[in-house]
């Protein structure tokens, strides 16, 4: 019996745990979270509340937790960088950690560094961008990009899940705007006013808005080759698994240059029919279960087996198909 621990994950890890159980019902799963009523609790064998710690202190907590509970596989999301810094200490305990070595976590946690690496190694296409820390440079970047591309967006370099992402929209808000979600839209004036409150501010990446389809590719390198399942996302709940040759080639070249061992997610967005690399997340995506369902591949299960030294057989059904999800009640 192997014991698997998932720390503070987003709620869709509910599906990741179910996939792990599907691959081997003998696994025991521990979940921890700051939120006592996280839906993940419903699919865990054991459940504990996490302390509110950061950085090295949090990594120390994780080491102690692994030691006390006899954890075999640790799947971190919270403070992944801090955990990966201490990878040697986890390995000394005999704990397999589903995280990349720290240099990769740091590289792909910084979009500016990642874009520079992609350009240096000729991996796909990346958008033009400016890095700014004051409103003067922000305005210069906006003017240069808007003249060339039209619409401009920005986000903080240190961000997860796109929480700071904003699209600059200077159109007057009228009656029609009441029927549209405005949470990611902000005028240039509003953006400048907000950024002035903490100037110089944390690095912000300013780039053209790419209006085409967003493609999320769930990936895992295995002993049998690369699993790469691209999901085309739009504003609806219906996603399409579509194997674009350029995207698949870019993913293959990415793994040749950066041999990541753990599950990751590579995101693209289209502009004028051309896919641009947006970012690489060194963890499973929140929608990995959609890819698994469409392609018939259990990425979480294969990844756990890989950490345990098992080369699990898999076969990817590359039929292009639509996939969606529905809300289900979860009693906590």
How does the language model describe each region?
Residues 40-42, 58-60, 106-112, 162-163, ...:
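Short, charged, surface-exposed secondary-structure boundary motifs
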Residues 7, 69, 237-249, 253-332:
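ATP-dependent carboxylate activation and anion-phosphoryl transfer catalytic cores
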Residues 105-203, 223:
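Active-site nucleotide/adenylate-binding loops and adjacent lid/helix of ATP-dependent enzymes
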Residues 178-254, 258, 269-270, 274-276:
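Phosphate-binding site of ATP-dependent enzymes
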Residues 1-101:
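ATP-binding N-terminal substructure of ATP-dependent carboxylate-amine bond-forming enzymes
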Residues 70, 94, 149-150, 259:
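Residue-level detector of structured alpha->beta connecting loops
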């Amino acid at each position: 019996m192997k014991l698997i621990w998932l720390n503070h994950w987003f709620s869709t890890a509910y599906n990741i745990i179910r996939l792990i159980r599907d691959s081997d019902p003998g696994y025991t799963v521990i979940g921890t979270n700051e939120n006592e009523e996280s839906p993940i609790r419903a699919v865990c064998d054991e459940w504990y509340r996490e302390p509110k710690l950061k950085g090295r202190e949090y990594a120390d907590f994780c080491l102690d937790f692994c030691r006390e509970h006899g954890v075999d596989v640790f799947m971190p999301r919270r403070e992944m960088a801090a955990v990966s810094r201490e990878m040697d200490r986890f390995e000394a305990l005999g704990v397999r950690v589903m995280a990349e070595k720290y240099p990769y976590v740091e590289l792909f946690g910084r979009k500016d560094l990642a874009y520079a690496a992609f350009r240096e190694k000729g991996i796909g296409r990346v958008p033009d961008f400016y890095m700014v820390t004051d409103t003067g440079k922000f305005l210069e970047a906006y003017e240069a990009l808007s003249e060339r591309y039209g619409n401009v967006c920005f986000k903080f370099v240190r961000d997860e899940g796109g929480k700071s992402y904003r699209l600059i929209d200077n159109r007057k808000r009228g009656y029609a705007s009441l029927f549209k979600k405005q949470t990611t839209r902000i005028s240039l004036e509003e953006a400048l006013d907000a950024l002035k409150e903490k100037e110089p501010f944390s690095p912000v990446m300013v780039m053209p808005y790419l209006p085409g389809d967003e493609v999320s590719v769930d990936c895992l390198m295995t002993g049998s080759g690369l699993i790469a399942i691209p999901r085309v996302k739009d504003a609806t709940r219906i996603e399409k698994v579509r194997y674009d040759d350029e995207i698949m080639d870019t993913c293959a070249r990415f793994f040749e240059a950066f041999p990541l061992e753990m599950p990751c997610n590579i995101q693209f967005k289209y502009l004028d029919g051309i896919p641009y690399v947006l970012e690489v997340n060194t963890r499973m995506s929140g929608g990995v279960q959609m890819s698994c369902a469409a392609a018939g591949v259990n990425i979480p299960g294969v990844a756990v087996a890989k950490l345990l030294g098992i080369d699990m057989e898999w076969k990817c059904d590359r039929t292009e198909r639509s996939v969606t999800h529905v809300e289900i009640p979860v009693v906590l």
